[in-house]
Amino acid sequence: MTMAIEDMFGDLRKIDILAESKAGEVLMVLVCNGFVDGSPETQKALLDKMEGYLNHTLSDEFQAEYPKWPVVLRITFTEEPDQLILDLLYKCQAWVNDYGAALEIEIGRRKIHFVEQG
């Protein structure tokens, strides 16, 4: 049985966590609960939520509060997602960088580092 999109990602229009790190970065955390499957609907929902986060960094309100701050978009999974989701996020790095943000992935509190696929 697959989980509902809202169970995996919460409200797609809401930023789960926005915090200031000790390193002087804006940390935006997107929390994914349970097993995140690789279906097209799930992939689209994840991209939509990520886009909401990234668009928020361009808002006047955000720019006024955090002018020139480095931004980290951290996608955190409570359990290992489908490989299709990891492949998708690998391909999203340049897109996230276009917004001036860095993409981090965490699975069960363990940071995942992408290696170049060649």
Regions found by a protein language model. Give the residues of each.
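Aromatic/basic-lined ligand-recognition segments
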Residues: T2-S21, E106-R110, V115-G118
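Short charge-dense sequence patches
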Residues: M1-F9, V36-L47
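Acidic, aromatic-enriched beta-alpha/helix-loop junctions
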Residues: P40-A64
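Short glycine-rich, basic-tinged beta-strand/loop micro-motifs
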Residues: G24-V36, Y66-E80
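Sterically constrained small-residue positions within well-ordered secondary structures
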Residues: A19-S21, A64-Y66, V96
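Amphipathic, soluble alpha/beta structural segments
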Residues: G10-R13, S21-V26, E80-I85
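Helix-rich interaction surfaces within compact, conserved domain-sized segments
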Residues: V71-V72, F77-G118
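Intrinsically disordered, low-complexity boundary segments flanking structured domains
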Residues: M1, I15-I17, D60-F62, C92
